[in-house]
């Protein structure tokens, strides 16, 4: 994988964490009937998990014990630290915070473990990974933390990396199909936050389940395709290239930004600031104001990470020892 491709994927990671920050900022507008928020929520975490799956190939080749040690330091230690800080500083319920605090890191940790154990099965991963996902769909509590929903995208990301050369031949076709499907989904109001996947959803609303799977997948493919296109068209322009390089640098700190935004956006800004007054028009608030606030706070979180990362204890406890 060349340097250009690494940079463009870091740009994708930047877009993913930007969408997370913007999406969380809509909590400040509880009375706003947002058009943008449900669209963001329909694919932003699938996008994140797909990218994680893409970069998981090396980790999934090491022994389970080594993987457990590595991902415990990188993912579980920040989870424990954030949960303790949240309970102590913000008074959250212990049980609620144990489950919900930085929930995506817990989800990702479990996805790594499941995929690694699956790779021990003496069958092609193209068979075992989908089978393991189907098992997750039907077992009790598989929908906890949306694991059985997001694990699908982790597997897709891994398989994309595994068959990247072959898929490059069809990338324009895949992008075009995804774009058409997502536009249709927008028109039919299918772009909504995914529901918890359990046996009731699978039995009584199978169409809704299939739709939310493909909305998340198509939205992710569109973002990745657009980011690649932007890099190809403008990456060599001096000024634009510097901006893209800056955004790509931010994309390398997504774990830290995700942790920091948990405190700054989720526990402080959106709790104490509520935009209930009709000072601004709903359309301006929805399409411009909140996205600008979320984008600005994403940049703030990035600089908080950069400033605090050199402090060894903070880096270890909150950022997974990021280098």
What do the PLM-derived regions correspond to, one by one?
Residues 1-323:
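Alpha-helical transmembrane segments and their immediate juxtamembrane cytosolic regions
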């Amino acid at each position: 994988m060349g340097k250009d491709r690494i940079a463009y994927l870091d740009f994708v990671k930047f877009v993913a964490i930007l969408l997370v920050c913007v999406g969380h900022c809509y909590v400040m507008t509880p009375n706003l009937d947002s058009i943008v928020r449900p669209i963001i929520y329909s694919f932003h975490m699938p996008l994140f998990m797909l990218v994680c799956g893409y970069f998981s190939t090396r980790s999934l080749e090491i022994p389970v014990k080594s993987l457990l040690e590595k991902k415990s330091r990188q993912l579980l230690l920040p989870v424990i630290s954030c949960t303790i800080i949240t309970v102590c500083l913000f008074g959250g319920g212990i049980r609620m915070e144990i489950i919900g605090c930085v929930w995506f890191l817990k989800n990702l940790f479990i996805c790594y473990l499941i995929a690694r154990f699956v790779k021990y099965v003496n069958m092609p991963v193209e068979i075992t990974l989908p089978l393991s996902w189907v098992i997750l769909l039907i077992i009790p509590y598989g929908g906890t933390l949306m694991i059985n929903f997001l694990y699908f995208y982790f597997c897709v990301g891994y398989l994309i990396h595994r068959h990247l050369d072959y898929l490059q031949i069809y990338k324009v076709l895949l992008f075009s199909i995804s774009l058409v499907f997502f536009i249709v989904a927008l028109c039919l109001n299918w772009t909504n936050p995914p529901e918890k996947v359990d046996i009731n959803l699978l039995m009584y609303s199978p169409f809704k389940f299939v739709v939310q799977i493909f909305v998340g997948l198509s939205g992710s493919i569109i973002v990745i395709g657009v980011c690649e296109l932007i890099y190809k068209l403008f990456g060599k322009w001096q000024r634009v290239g510097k901006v893209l390089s800056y955004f790509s640098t931010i994309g390398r700190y997504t774990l830290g930004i995700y942790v920091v935004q948990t405190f700054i956006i989720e526990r402080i800004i959106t709790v104490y600031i509520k935009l209930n007054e009709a000072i601004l028009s709903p359309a301006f608030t929805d399409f411009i104001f909140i996205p600008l606030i979320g984008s600005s706070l994403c940049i703030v979180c990035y600089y908080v990470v950069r400033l605090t990362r050199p402090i060894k204890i903070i880096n270890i406890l909150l950022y997974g020892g990021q280098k």
